[in-house]
Every structure is written in structure tokens, then in C-alpha cells.
């Protein structure tokens, strides 16, 4: 099959040259800067020519940013504005605070031509960094399995780790199934947190973005598809993360 990928780099304030300075023009063409929060001043590299402002999309809903869905809200907007991804075979979600290393995009394309069902990730974290009990993981996965009508096996994430921080690229059908789930169930997920269902808030004050991160990670490792690590660095320490103040699941893992 002919592979057509795009990495959407989600940012509310900046995307610097250093994030993409090692990429060729052909690789840069596989990136789109996706900006949120209209009122926040932006510092965006000119190296990435493609840009989407979420607030200008035909369908847009600021509630997803207001409720701290962040990059997961962008997933919903990519799903509902289908023209944005209709020609793609694979969808990537990145933060602004990454560094694409040399050949990091082309290597993904080369791998996908051999196995288009591969899921690419930046980091797999162990259960000790979940801030959830095994019971709570199982209940979240039961909820997802019912709503998505597909098995999400919490024991896989518990035993082998979970793909974290959203940083990933997946086949479009994998992406769309999760984005559809968020679109249809985000209010109930908020209710799970608000009402401390299954005592899910007892370990730390989880925020929407953190729970969605974990649910995305549980879902991906349950797909029984090949997993391969991206050659992309998460450059967390070079940035101030103001949205992580009053920490929820914005736990900085060492």
C-alpha cells in the first residue's frame, strides 16, 4: 500500500526551529503545526509550512481545551473535521516539546511500507507511574471495552507497560476508533473524575488530560499490533509547562 502519514504537532504557544531542524524538506512536508487557544500569543517556526488553527475549523468546540483534554481534544477535532485526515493512512500526534532526529520521519515511512499496521510510540512507562491501582485500571478498561466495542485489556498495560504522553503514530483506523470514543464519551469520562468513580482520584488529583493519556496508552497496547519506538526525543526539560501547575497527572517522572 502507498503510505501517507502526517504528524500533527499540538501547541498552545510555541513550536521552535530546534524541534524540526534535523528534517529534510520532504520530511517537513509530513508535519502540521496544530495550534489551540486563540488568545495565547504564538511563537511558531516557519520551517513547518502546514498549520491548523483549531478555532478556525468548521467544527470546533473550546470545551475540550477548557476541560483540559489538550492534545486529546485535537484528536476529536481531527476526527470530526474529516477532511483533515481523509487522505492519510496514518495519523501522528506530537507535543511541541519534541525533537525529530535525523531521518526520524523517513524511517517511519520505510517501516510502514513493510508493515502498515505498526504502531509507533515514543515512551512506554511501567505500572508504577500510572498513579492507579490494578483494580482502577481494570475498571477503566472495562468502560472502554464496552463503549468502543473492542477489547481493551488492562492486564497488558499492568504487566508490560503503557504508551504514554500521546506521542505516537498509528494506522488511521486505530486513531479514529479512539477519537470517536472520546467524542461520544468525554462527558462521562469527566463524570468519572468528578465523582471519583472506582476511587480513581485517591492516588492523585487526576485531570482529564492524564486519564485520557492513560486510556489511549491502554488502548494502543491492547491492539495486538507491532510496536516500534520513534526516533523522536521528548525535550520536556527545555520548556516551562505552565499548564502543569496545580499538578494533576502532569507528574514529572524521573
Range-by-range predicted roles:
Residues 1-254:
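ER/Golgi luminal nucleotide-sugar-dependent glycosyltransferases, focusing on the catalytic module
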Amino acid at each position: 500500500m502507498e503510505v501517507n502519514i502526517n504528524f500533527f504537532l499540538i501547541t498552545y504557544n510555541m513550536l521552535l526551529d530546534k524541534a524540526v531542524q534535523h528534517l529534510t524538506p520532504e520530511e517537513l512536508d509530513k508535519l502540521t503545526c496544530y495550534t489551540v487557544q486563540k488568545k495565547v500569543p504564538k511563537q511558531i517556526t516557519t520551517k513547518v509550512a502546514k498549520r491548523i488553527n483549531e478555532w478556525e475549523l468548521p467544527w470546533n468546540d473550546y470545551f475540550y481545551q477548557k476541560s483540559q483534554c489538550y492534545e486529546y481534544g485535537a484528536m476529536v477535532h481531527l476526527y470530526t473535521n474529516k477532511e483533515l485526515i481523509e487522505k492519510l493512512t496514518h495519523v501522528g500526534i506530537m507535543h511541541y516539546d519534541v525533537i525529530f532526529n535525523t531521518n526520524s520521519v523517513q524511517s517511519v515511512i520505510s517501516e510502514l511500507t513493510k508493515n502498515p499496521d505498526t504502531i509507533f510510540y515514543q515512551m512506554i512507562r511501567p505500572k508504577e507511574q500510572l498513579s492507579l491501582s490494578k483494580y482502577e485500571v481494570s475498571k477503566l478498561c472495562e468502560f472502554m471495552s464496552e463503549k468502543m466495542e473492542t477489547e481493551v485489556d488492562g492486564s497488558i498495560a499492568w504487566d508490560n507497560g503503557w504508551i504514554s504522553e500521546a506521542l505516537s503514530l498509528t494506522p488511521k483506523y486505530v486513531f479514529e476508533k479512539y477519537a470517536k470514543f472520546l467524542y461520544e464519551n468525554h462527558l462521562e469520562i469527566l463524570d468519572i473524575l468528578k465523582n471519583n468513580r472506582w476511587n480513581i482520584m485517591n492516588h492523585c488529583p487526576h485531570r482529564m488530560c492524564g486519564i485520557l493519556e492513560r486510556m489511549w496508552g491502554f488502548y494502543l497496547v491492547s491492539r495486538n499490533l507491532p510496536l516500534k519506538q520513534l526516533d523522536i526525543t521528548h525535550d520536556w526539560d527545555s520548556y516551562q509547562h505552565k499548564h502543569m501547575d496545580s499538578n494533576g497527572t502532569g507528574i514529572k517522572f524521573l
